A protein has these predicted regions:
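Conserved, well-structured ligand/cofactor-binding cores
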Residues: 1-159
Length: 159
């Protein structure tokens, strides 16, 4: 049973139970969580422009994603980093957290997925094979920017 305090849902809980492989969990990788939120935000904007989401759904999902970007709710990502497949458990964990937070922002209860579904709304027009590698690329880009900055500082210190 999903804990009452959890923003994640039953798919995440099943993933936790099925994949106890390493001691490394998604919540230990904030940059990857943020990159996944950015990926979801991009899909929401595109889906709203195509009228595949209502304005209310899109606004709530975007607000939930922004909260994740600000570092909120990171404890809600307990899945193991090593999983079977291509990261489906990670993708569903993110979808469920964003959907349930969006539901709260819309004035609904967690799990009332007829209003905002992890699959049908947050993950619309995506698959794990889209979202996961896109987030990896986004995370690498931001890591690259930090590395370039630090190399610049190192070079300056030698002058």
């Amino acid at each position: 049973e999903v804990p009452e305090s959890a923003l994640y849902g039953v798919q995440t809980l099943r993933g936790i139970e099925n994949f106890r492989i390493s001691k490394f969990h998604l919540n230990e990788y904030p940059l990857f969580i943020q990159a996944l939120a950015i990926t979801k935000m991009g899909a929401v904007v595109a889906n709203r422009k195509l009228d595949l989401l209502t304005e209310e759904q899109a606004d709530a999902i975007l607000k939930a994603c922004k909260e994740v970007l600000e570092g909120k709710h990171h404890e809600q990502f307990p899945v193991d980093m090593i999983q079977g497949g291509a990261g489906t458990t990670t993708n569903m964990n993110v979808n469920e957290v964003i959907a349930n937070r969006a539901l709260e922002l819309m004035g609904h209860r967690r799990g009332e997925y007829q209003y905002c579904s992890p699959n049908d709304h947050v993950n619309r027009s995506q698959s794990t094979n889209d979202a996961y590698p896109t987030a990896i690329h986004i995370g690498l880009y931001y890591t690259h920017l930090k590395l370039v900055k630090h190399f610049g500082e190192l070079i300056a210190s030698f002058r």
